[in-house]
Amino acid sequence: MGSEKDSESPRSTSLHAAAPDPKCRSGGRRRRLTFHSVFSASARGRRARTKPQAEPPPPAAPPPPPPPAPAPVEAQAPPVEALPSEPAAEAEAEAVAAGPEEDEAAEGGGAEEVECPLCLVRLPPERAPRLLSCPHRSCRDCLRHYLRLEISESRVPISCPECSERLNPHDIRLLLADPPLMHKYEEFMLRRYLASDPDCRWCPAPDCGYAVIAYGCASCPKLTCEREGCQTEFCYHCKQIWHPNQTCDMARQQRAQTLRVRTKHTSGLSYGQESGPADDIKPCPRCSAYIIKMNDGSCNHMTCAVCGCEFCWLCMKEISDLHYLSPSGCTFWGKKPWSRKKKILWQLGTLIGAPVGISLIAGIAIPAMVIGIPVYVGRKIHSRYEGRKTSKHKRNLAITGGVTLSVIASPVIAAVSVGIGVPIMLAYVYGVVPISLCRGGGCGVSTANGKGVKIEFDEDDGPITVADAWRALKNPSIGESSIEGLTSVLSTSGSPTDGLSVMQGPYSETASFAALSGGTLSGGILSSGKGKYSRLEVQADVQKEIFPKDTASLGAISDSASTRAMAGSIISSYNPQDRECNNMEIQVDIEAKPSHYQLVSGSSTEDSLHVHAQVAEKEEEGNGAGGGSGGSEDDPPYKHQSCEQKDCLASKAWDISLAQPESIRSDLESSDTQSDDVPDITSDECGSPRSHAAACPSTPQVHGAPSPSAHKNLAAPAEGQTVLKSEEYEVE
């Protein structure tokens, strides 16, 4: 019953009918769509378009006929759907797995050769080793040559040729494969590390490379090298051989004097700008490594290759970025720093012109900021909205708002800038500039013996003038900086007759002043040289016509021109019976008083000396005839009648008055002069040579005539040399 109903129902007939439906295009097979099948089909389509078309596969065999008893649709649907999807999934997995391999192979094929950045040659990767510090690669030969060059030039630590990363020492060792060069690299690295230690001191012995790290040894500066066989003692402060009982400055001067090289112009061992060859050598101020630089006015900002110290080549001091903007006198380019005169003029100019300049800058900056800031803001906003697709109304609104805000804020910004900038500039001009100049010794301001402030200008570049000679005579100085001839030396002595001579100094850079006088300082000679510094010498010979002479040289040791020296006994030279020389200590006070000088040419000096000699002989004959027959032939020609010779020369102090040229009085009025409160020590008993205007009529008159023996010892002046001839000297 049930089976018949089932067979007669319309549903069962439609499912099991053998005749196909003419409206259905497929043969009755249905397929279920899923997300996996949709995306896998699209992926297969893309791969098919990108990959070259392969040969079509051979036609598959026709499917077997269906079984006679059809299975239900629900039971047969899953196998039908799995048949086409499984090969697609496997093909997709194979394509995904093969994709990265193909990409890596393509990339590997393009990176087979590496281009060296040094020689620009494409090489295989095995010839371009990888570095541990950075990813850059270069060929092995170029790296080896680069390392050799850097080590030989002591440029350690070594950086990558393409970047600033430092190379690993392990890479350097593998690339070099040279033990001696690697040892040199390690030594340079050690020296560079030790140079950064402020307490490290290297042994100054020439054959020793030992260093001593001395912590807290400033109070006990004596160090000893601990290397076996060296044991050199040296100083902690100056890093030189130990100098007992001497300061570092004194030892430095002594070393400079012993190492001084006498060239044609007698240029000493110094760091002067005018001395030395074109290739100048100076030590680093930190590690004392010698550095050579062409003296061609190139850049003066130097960097030590050993310790990395940045210093100025002109002043040899460690510097900062603002060193060449400070009033130190050092320039970024050039062969020498500013002179003292230029520093002082620059300082005075800044001190006087700073208020005017700062006011002018502030007056220009305030309107420029008030007007310029809104204009700048408006242009920036307009350029920002220019490339965008925005409405014109919105753009104009943004520009108007920005300009309005900038107009309100610009006066505030200008006021703050001027309020902060002006005090900073004033503090720099009136604080930093004078302090830096005076700290470096370049201000030239000093106190003049309690008489006020004196400004000293440096006149090193100009010729030596009479005023310079007179200043050197009045204010001799001996300092620790006299290595190159900075000392002005004043030496005086006496002789029986007054005379004037020309003597060329032993050094070409020295202006030598010489004079022969009878018991007084009678004259000076100005012989200018080519050098930068001058030395003042006044020499005299004390002698009898037939007896040997004794010379006294007195060195200036104080600013009051008071000289002390050990001289031979003047008494013995005047006493014919007592010819033994006895040493005595004398003190001569030199006081400047006005008289007259005149300039004569060097070619006429010898003639003028002969004329003065003839005049002196005539005066001597006239005085001898009028003075009586009380004297003998052996008595001194200028012996006073009322005293003995020994008492006259040995027991009395002589006051020597040196004349002052009238041509330089105006120049000396503005400079420091000698104190006028020094009492004159006169002799009422001893006779002294006086002029025609002297009070004592019995004293012989002398006008600078030398004795024949003294005239023979004088050096003849060179042609064209200007000589000072003294017309009148007054001795009290």
Curated annotation (Swiss-Prot):
Stored CDD domains: BRcat-RBR_RNF19B, Rcat_RBR_RNF19, RING-HC_RBR_RNF19B
Gene Ontology BP term (one): adaptive immune response
Subunit and partners: Interacts with UBE2L3, UBE2L6 and UCKL1.
Role according to the record: E3 ubiquitin-protein ligase which accepts ubiquitin from E2 ubiquitin-conjugating enzymes UBE2L3 and UBE2L6 in the form of a thioester and then directly transfers the ubiquitin to targeted substrates, such as UCKL1. Involved in the cytolytic activity of natural killer cells and cytotoxic T-cells. Protects against staurosporin-induced cell death.
Keyword terms of this UniProt record: Adaptive immunity, Endoplasmic reticulum, Immunity, Membrane, Metal-binding, Repeat, Transferase, Transmembrane, Transmembrane helix, Ubl conjugation pathway, Zinc, Zinc-finger
Organism: Mus musculus (Mouse)
Name of the protein described by the UniProt record: E3 ubiquitin-protein ligase RNF19B
Membrane-crossing residue ranges in chain numbering: 351-371, 412-432
Membrane topology annotation: Multi-pass membrane protein
Chain positions recorded as Zn(2+) 1 binding sites: 116, 119, 139, 142
Gene behind the chain: Rnf19b
